[in-house]
Amino acid sequence: MQNCRRCISLTGLLRMTLYLRPSFSIDLSLRRLHRAAFLFSRKKPETNLSTLFKPVQVHAYVDSEDVGSELSGKLEKAELLKILNKFTQRREIKSLCNENGLDDYLQQQAFGSFRRFCIEAENLPVDLHITFSDITQGAGHIDDIFPYFLRHAKTVFPHLDCMDDLKKISDLRQPANWYSNARAITRKIVFHAGPTNSGKTYHAMERYLSAKTGVYCGPLKLLATEVYNKANERGTPCDLVTGEERKFGISESLPANHVACTVEMTSVNTPYEVAVIDEIQQIRDPQRGWAWTRAFLGLIADEVHVCGEPGALDLLQKICETTGETVEVRLYDRLTELTVENTALGSLDNIVPGDCIVCFSKHDIYTVSREIEARGKEVAVIYGGLPPGTKLAQAAKFNDPANSCKVMVATDAIGMGLNLSIRRIIFYSLIKPSMNERGEREIDTISVSSALQIAGRAGRFRTQWEHGYVTAFKSEDLQTLQRILARTPEPIKQAGLHPTADQIELYAYHLPSSSLSNLMDIFVNLCTVDDSLYFMCNIEDFKFLAEMIQHVALPLRARYVFCCAPINRKMPFVCSMFLKVARQYSRNEPITFDFIKKNCGWPFKLPKTILDLVHLEAVFDVMDLYLWLSYRFMDLFPEAAYVRDAQKELDEIIQQGVFQITRLLKNTEASQDGETSNYAIRRITHVKEPRLPSLSRGRLTERLLAQGLLTPGMLSELRKEWDAQQLGKSNSQSNENSEPVVNSDDEDNYSGIGRKTRKKRRK
């Protein structure tokens, strides 16, 4: 328990794992428990750098004339083997290997390769043959083999000859020096610091719009699009640049002086008068933080206006010390009042107009939405997987005073990018899955920064709900929420970095036999970073895509670009389409709209179930992928206009599906009666806590231990928690002989477990 950052007991995790719907198999429970146990027991092993270097196969030496034998006679294979075995066991040889960069792992690999090279070859190089002959005749020493062995080892492991070059390429200690054009001018850095709804971005944008030239760098397409629209409405021609889209304030042939873009698309080669970097606290993001670091260090602008949390100030000042710049700080207070309520919501019966329930999982979104609509209230739904148009439509529906929809259910996707008129934020849970900088999945209490960002959405300036309120759904979460919101966000300590395509190309030049995934691993493990200011961003998504298309013949630069594509690797359909597109590209065949239609099931139909809706969302992401690639490989993705039109049509269909999400939920459950579905598998029914089956004996415990999903220590801890719970309940339950309280549709599944458990305990 000591090595766990979670606020969930082991018993609680087992409840989440084991008490599922009746149709769930025990294998599913094992998989879920595997993930739960992983959170408690996983410690990332230290990587031995040498194991990342894959040996290069050395072809056998061919000499049809066998000059070595003519000069010094034939060599017996058995005698050669004795010499080689003695050679590999000598301490002096191992010491020489260490001096030449061959650690124990590399020695073992190189010795094995050298032995096979000598034994399996029909004949040897002349100089090596003569050396072996001298040793067998007593005219030479066994150590004389070392120069030939070292030559072979450097052929097997080419990095031995270029280790200094590799280290120099991956020296990331001074990223500010990568941007010589930005360092050549004196930039004015202005930090607009304040909480949500404080007007900090407004003041930065006013300066942006008044400048002769400017660029806005935002975290989301929605924010960039909003700036694009506002600038053009106010008479300032502005272009839009995102990964998947280009729009022009004047015309395609005449670029506007102002640009609104997503932060990854920021140009560090174009000079501007004013640059605005929004949500600078994202510089610490484990996946995308590098983009904010690049923009902050690389923008060529007379004025760089940075907006975000005050917690980023110390880090920005330290980074500016390395560039010789200073930071002008402008602090802002919240424009409207925000009150944390003293009572939890407790029940969905207490929902009132203007409420927004924030959930951290799709299945909670579905469950809460249906429960609210069952009470006769219309619901707007927003989560990260929805297309931007659908999000805007749902936001407009909720914001419209004339619309009957007065309640919203959303994920933390509402934290930025949408203007919402919310009276009260209700946290359905405080437990949120996240990914740390090492690429490990964590379940933890929501961070102070995230909680304040979401809570701050309540009570917006100049809307019908200027006074905002915040509370929790569960009474047991309320005190924790109050403590979180009373705290100041922790100062941001590090900014993200990421290998560039140029750096990886240089690595590939020195290590031509290594795969892209392998090159990334070597780079990350070999790089030097000033960890007082920076960290290396997580590359697991990049590696996942690199390994997926490793067998596809692509040039390195194209392979790198493909692996940078914004893909959710948890969506199998999107991943399979990514692979198909890569194969088509590798054959130099255009990826046409017909290709997309054929593989995505066009024309699209209205979704009838949640599974249909999820699939349409995946198809939308595939079209996003096409558009993203079309701006990078225009010749082989020639029909972006057709795909964009189809995507707009699909967006409208998804909107209609989300508008009737409750009916989709009903259809899903009706169609899955008596069978297991992907949706049902993911859904955990919220029930009062039934008794746990005995963990001290039985087939399940044995299987968990045998598969390594539970350790004896974890099992002991579980027993202690179980006994403590039963002891606390014994007084109140001593005269009761009732079944556990469950939902009616789960009763058959749980009652048998409960009876068996009580029989065992009575025995």
Curated annotation (Swiss-Prot):
Its EC number is 3.6.4.13. The keyword Transit peptide applies. GO terms for biological process: mitochondrial mRNA catabolic process; mitochondrial mRNA polyadenylation; mitochondrial RNA 3'-end processing; mitochondrial RNA processing; mitochondrial tRNA processing; positive regulation of mitochondrial translation; regulation of mitochondrial mRNA stability. InterPro entries: DEXQc_SUV3, Helicase_C-like, P-loop_NTPase, RNA-DNA_Helicase, SUV3_C, Suv3_C_1, Suv3_DEXQc, Suv3_N. ATP binds at residues 194-201. GO terms for molecular function: ATP binding; ATP hydrolysis activity; DNA binding; DNA helicase activity; RNA helicase activity. It holds the Pfam family SUV3_C. Residues 1-43 form a transit peptide. Its main location: mitochondrion. Disruption phenotype: Lethal due to mitochondrial dysfunction. 3 days after egg laying (ael) larvae display a severe decrease in size and a significant increase in mitochondrial mRNA steady-state levels which results in larval lethality by 4 days ael. RNAi-mediated knockdown is pupal lethal. Larvae display significant increases in mitochondrial mRNA and anti-sense RNA steady-state levels but rRNA (12S and 16S) steady-state levels and de novo transcription are not affected. Larvae also display severe decreases in mitochondrial tRNA steady state levels and accumulation of unprocessed precursor transcripts. It is found in: Mitochondrion. Residues 724-763 are annotated as: Disordered. Its cofactor is Mg(2+); Mn(2+). SMART domains: HELICc. It catalyses: ATP + H2O = ADP + phosphate + H(+). One of its GO terms (cellular component) is mitochondrial matrix. Keywords: ATP-binding, Helicase, Hydrolase, Mitochondrion, Nucleotide-binding, Transit peptide. Residues 330-508 form the Helicase C-terminal domain. It comes from the Eukaryota. Residues 727-741 have a biased composition (Polar residues). The keyword ATP-binding applies. Residues 181-321 form the Helicase ATP-binding domain. Belongs to the helicase family. PANTHER family: ATP-DEPENDENT RNA AND DNA HELICASE, ATP-DEPENDENT RNA HELICASE SUPV3L1, MITOCHONDRIAL-RELATED. Major helicase player in mitochondrial RNA metabolism and maintenance. Likely component of the mitochondrial degradosome (mtEXO) complex, that degrades 3' overhang double-stranded RNA with a 3'-to-5' directionality in an ATP-dependent manner. ATPase and ATP-dependent multisubstrate helicase, able to unwind double-stranded (ds) DNA and RNA, and RNA/DNA heteroduplexes in the 5'-to-3' direction. Regulates mRNA stability and is required for the correct processing and maturation of mitochondrial transcripts. This is ATP-dependent RNA helicase SUV3 homolog, mitochondrial. It comes from Drosophila melanogaster (Fruit fly).
